[in-house]
Amino acid sequence: MAEYLASIFGTEKDKVNCSFYFKIGACRHGDRCSRLHNKPTFSQTIALLNIYRNPQNSSQSADGLRCAVSDVEMQEHYDEFFEEVFTEMEEKYGEVEEMNVCDNLGDHLVGNVYVKFRREEDAEKAVIDLNNRWFNGQPIHAELSPVTDFREACCRQYEMGECTRGGFCNFMHLKPISRELRRELYGRRRKKHRSRSRSRERRSRSRDRGRGGGGGGGGGGGRERDRRRSRDRERSGRF
């Protein structure tokens, strides 16, 4: 019996635990759901709830009419948002394996950002800190998410351009970033790994020669760039 219950846990056959919450980390019924939402006590993934504001869904003029936002402006706005959040997560909390943003319209998914860290400790640290921070004038609501495999959480029909439910689909409609930004963000991480490897090799050679000093001043430029970037973000009023 125990093996059977374990095999159906989080599936449609499970009458106790909510399969949607298990797969997606969100459920349209919320606290009114008749099945249990088992919130994880540890996870690599965090959810930042309703943090992304799609200007195509919210832009209105003073007279209440919807303002047109071009696709180019939309992509630029989204890429800027994605880069800002991704960079903040990596610089403050730890290495990010992947980050995804929901483009759904349902209340339980709209604007949700899912950040999967390489280490569970970094995810836990991020949740604790982010719940005391604000973004774009709003308090951040962060929580650990059960989602670790986004292939199970995504709407396959949407990826093929065939979803008939539109923005109110209960599976994730993930908004893509531009190819250029993807190369920049994830390529930067690969360069960082190579740089760390070379740095370890240099330290090893230095120890072999029995010398320890001389290389401590090279990080000033990077620290200055980090300070400038932090000041720029403060002026922008987002994080």
Curated annotation (Swiss-Prot):
UniProt keyword annotations, A-Z: Acetylation, Metal-binding, Methylation, mRNA processing, mRNA splicing, Nucleus, Phosphoprotein, Repeat, RNA-binding, Spliceosome, Zinc, Zinc-finger
Biased composition, class Basic residues, residue ranges: 188-208
Coiled-coil spans in chain: none
Compartments where found: Nucleus; Nucleus speckle
Biased composition (Gly residues): 212-221
Tissues where this protein is expressed: Expressed in primary spermatocytes and elongating spermatids (at protein level).
A molecular function (GO) term: RNA binding
Gene Ontology biological process terms, A to Z: mRNA splicing, via spliceosome
Residues found modified as N-acetylalanine: 2
Domain comment, as recorded: The C-terminal SR-rich domain is required for interactions with SR proteins and the splicing regulators TRA and TRA2, and the N-terminal domain is required for formation of the U2AF1/U2AF2 heterodimer.
Listed PANTHER family: U2 SNRNP AUXILIARY FACTOR, SMALL SUBUNIT
Stated name of the protein: Splicing factor U2AF 35 kDa subunit
Organism: Mus musculus (Mouse)
